[in-house]
């Protein structure tokens, strides 16, 4: 596994743009204070792309199944080719921390609970929605003291909490290239016989796995592609 633009020239075939795939993302902001914290079953979005999954914070950014699957969408939406240079990235992703509730549902719940549970501290109330180890960071980013009672939080601050629960954003500055798990792009499939994996341009030349412009989400799909195309290529070559 991994992502490297090297050796594609050896294929003697037309090759699509080579890009990072299933890659952790590096953030502009230092996240070392919450490294190791996991958010479960959240929805991560970039423009119109949305992925549901877990997010793990690292010392340099974001990883976990949800992030690395979304990274494919991000990578494919950006015009670049690793055969030429690394991409320059300056973008924003958003995390819906409460995907089971609509914005209106969350607003209604906040309004009810802030009246009924006025003496409750906000850091304790947020345990209904967030993992404990993320609450302090979330409140710091929202500009609210963790020991504030619900009754003392004004409307503007309450709305900011709701907005951040539904759309908590991070600025992304690059892919974590050393930890990218697959390569997006490769030998153009239209020049490969799918029944044999043999090149349509050069007889007795076969391709398999990530040399091809084939990739999938995390979860063993890329290994399956490698095993199946490798088996087919080897079997086809042995027939000749």
Where are these regions (language model features)?
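A conserved FAD-binding loop/helix module that cradles the flavin
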Residues: 1-11, 214-240
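Domain-scale detector for complete catalytic domains at protein termini or as standalone homologs
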Residues: 2-3, 124-125, 134, 173-174, ...
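Generic secondary-structure signature for well-ordered alpha-helical cores
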Residues: 12-13, 49, 158, 166-171, ...
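Short Asp/Glu-rich motifs
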Residues: 27-28, 184, 235
């Amino acid at each position: 596994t991994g992502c490297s633009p090297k050796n594609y020239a050896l294929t003697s075939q037309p090759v699509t743009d080579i890009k990072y795939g299933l890659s952790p993302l590096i953030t502009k902001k230092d996240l070392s204070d919450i490294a190791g914290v996991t958010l479960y079953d959240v929805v991560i979005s970039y423009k119109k792309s949305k992925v549901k999954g877990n997010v793990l914070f690292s010392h340099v950014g974001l990883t976990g199944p949800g992030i690395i699957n979304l990274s494919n969408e991000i990578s494919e939406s950006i015009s670049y080719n690793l055969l030429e240079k690394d991409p320059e990235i300056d973008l924003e992703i958003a995390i819906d921390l409460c995907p089971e509730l609509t914005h209106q549902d969350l607003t209604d719940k906040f309004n009810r609970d802030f009246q009924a549970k006025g003496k409750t501290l906000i850091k304790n109330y947020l345990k209904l929605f967030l993992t404990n180890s993320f609450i302090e960071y979330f409140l710091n980013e929202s500009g609210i003291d963790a020991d504030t009672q619900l009754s003392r939080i004004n409307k503007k601050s309450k709305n900011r909490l709701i907005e951040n629960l539904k759309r908590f954003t991070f600025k992304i500055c690059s892919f974590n290239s050393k930890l990218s798990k697959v390569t997006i792009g490769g030998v153009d499939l239209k020049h490969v016989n799918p029944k044999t994996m043999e090149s349509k341009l050069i007889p007795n030349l076969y391709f398999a796995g990530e040399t091809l412009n084939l990739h999938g989400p995390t979860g063993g799909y890329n290994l399956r592609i490698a095993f199946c195309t490798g088996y087919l290529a080897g079997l086809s070559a042995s027939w000749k």
